[in-house]
Design a protein with these regions (language model features):
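Residue-level recognition of pore/gate-forming positions within transmembrane alpha-helices
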Residues: 15-18, 66-70, 121
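A glycine-rich, hydrophobic loop/mini-helix early in the fold
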Residues: 47-77
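Membrane-embedded alpha-helical hairpins and interfacial helices in multi-pass inner-membrane proteins
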Residues: 83-182
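Interfacial aromatic-anchored transmembrane helix boundaries in multi-pass membrane proteins
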Residues: 23-35, 70-89
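Hydrophobic transmembrane alpha-helices
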Residues: 1-54
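Membrane-interface helix-boundary motifs at transmembrane edges
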Residues: 2-3, 51-59, 103-108
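Structural signal for membrane-spanning alpha-helices in multi-pass inner-membrane proteins
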Residues: 18-26, 73-77, 128, 132, ...
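Cytoplasmic-side transmembrane-helix entry/capping segments in multi-pass membrane proteins
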Residues: 6-11, 57-68, 108-115
């Protein structure tokens, strides 16, 4: 049961981030960004912490679990088109994040989370905004540009909590062994 605890908490964290972001994306701050741009990058933090601490296999479990729970709540809390766009973009981008993270994980501690989050955020942004808003009168292209700029800034800022959380997990006496399954 102890081995499932990180996955359980990862899934809960991911589901909360997805559901909150899917509601927040409907509330623009200005013509360039919505509130969702400030909350969603935390999903990449959750994925990267799980990947670094517990392995790619467990990170994927968190992504799949977070996807299922997040989509259910998103359908309930947000517009169906937002939920569909979110699910598609989330699943694609998070799995790419895990893949890229593992390819560059032997570099310095900050490169894997920054590079993987930057690339997968671009994919997430294009998929989400084109599915959610294409054909609407909303300024979704400028929202997408602003969203990606925020995601890049957040990828950099979230390196601090990434390092702190990894240090805490690494220093715990009862650490769950990292799954090295690709």
């Amino acid at each position: 049961m102890h081995a499932l605890r990180p996955i359980f908490f990862g899934v809960i964290a991911m589901a909360i981030v997805v559901a909150v972001s899917n509601v927040a994306v409907g509330y623009p701050i200005n013509d360039w960004i919505t509130w969702g741009a400030l909350t969603y990058p935390v999903a990449f933090l959750v994925t990267d912490v799980m990947n670094r601490s517990f392995g790619a296999s467990n990170a994927r479990k968190v992504v799949y679990g977070g996807f299922l729970v997040g989509v259910i709540f998103s359908i309930w809390l947000a517009d169906i088109r937002i939920a569909l766009a979110s699910g598609t973009a989330f699943l694609t981008a998070q799995l790419i994040d895990i893949f890229v993270f593992n390819k560059v994980s032997q570099k310095t501690w900050w490169q894997a989370p920054f590079i993987s989050s930057s690339l997968s955020s671009a994919i997430d942004t294009v998929l989400f905004f084109s599915i959610a808003f294409i054909g609407s009168e909303l300024p979704w292209v400028t929202w997408a540009a602003g969203d990606y700029a925020i995601k890049l800034a957040m990828a950099m800022l979230l390196l601090v909590p990434f390092k702190l959380v990894i240090s805490i997990i690494t220093n715990q006496a009862a650490v769950v062994p990292r799954d090295t399954t690709p």
